Amino acid sequence: MSRFTFKQFHINQDSCAMKVSTDGILLGAWADVKHCKNILDMGSGTGLLALMLAQRTEENCQIQAVELDPIAVKQAQENINDSVWKNRIQLIQTDIQHFLQTTAQTFDLIVANPPYFEQGIACKNEERELARYTKQSHLNWLEWAATRLSENGRISFVLPYEAGKTLIKSTALFCIKQTNVITKIGKTPQRMLLTFAKQPQVLMQDQLVIYDADNQYTEAFIKLTKDFYLKF
């Protein structure tokens, strides 16, 4: 699908390596945006997360989206320019680590749908490989993000379930929210939505089931994503 149309914006993705995914949509709808004035989207791809978060936040919230791949940057800029939030989203083409080491800005929310496929799986093109693979671990991404987090800020990731469990054990940050994502009722969790903070808080844990036993979307999934999907 070369274009993915949402209720308030669209994503052109014909030349971008990584397409719109349920993972990204879940994170964009799930991340806590309360009291956010500055948001960072790490590894923006098509610009999906930046646009979803722009839709969910107030006009005074500014969003910076960082992406290394020049082809993805070109397409993301087109998507942003076609939206009503183009004046609130700044797209930056650079390496994430370099950006975080050089910016003076701190962020109230940092989001990422990071690469998680292991090295060694063949990809058809270099751009897709760049988007899917990383020599850096999820812990690296989290630690880099933490350096530019405001005192009461939050970092939210979507990860494979086992990778999420590993990250929670590995970081010195506090996991304050965890949602285990189950594709269909009765199955084991496949994904994990996580929020980390510098300060300890009571951990909020729950689960989200996407499909019920009749292969229909659950009420919880519809409630979470209804502001975006045309079908709801």
From Swiss-Prot:
GO CC field: cytoplasm
Chief site of localization: cytoplasm
Keyword Cell membrane (UniProt): no
Signal peptide: none
Organism: Haemophilus influenzae (strain PittGG)
GO MF entries: nucleic acid binding; tRNA (adenine-N6)-methyltransferase activity
Family as reported in the entry's similarity comment: Belongs to the methyltransferase superfamily. tRNA (adenine-N(6)-)-methyltransferase family.
PANTHER family in the cross-refs: TRNA1(VAL) (ADENINE(37)-N6)-METHYLTRANSFERASE
Gene3D superfamilies in alphabetical order: Vaccinia Virus protein VP39
InterPro entries (alphabetical): DNA_methylase_N6_adenine_CS (IPR002052), SAM-dependent_MTases_sf (IPR029063), Small_mtfrase_dom (IPR007848), tRNA_Adenine-N(6)_MTase (IPR050210), tRNA_adenine-N6_MeTrfase (IPR022882)
CDD domains: AdoMet_MTases (cd02440)
An individual GO BP term: tRNA processing
Keywords: Cytoplasm, Methyltransferase, S-adenosyl-L-methionine, Transferase, tRNA processing
Summary of the function given for this chain in its UniProt record: Specifically methylates the adenine in position 37 of tRNA(1)(Val) (anticodon cmo5UAC).
Subcellular location: Cytoplasm
HAMAP family according to UniProt: tRNA_methyltr_YfiC (MF_01872)
Record EC number: 2.1.1.223
Annotated Pfam families: MTS
Catalytic activity of the protein: adenosine(37) in tRNA1(Val) + S-adenosyl-L-methionine = N(6)-methyladenosine(37) in tRNA1(Val) + S-adenosyl-L-homocysteine + H(+)
Name of the protein in question: tRNA1(Val) (adenine(37)-N6)-methyltransferase
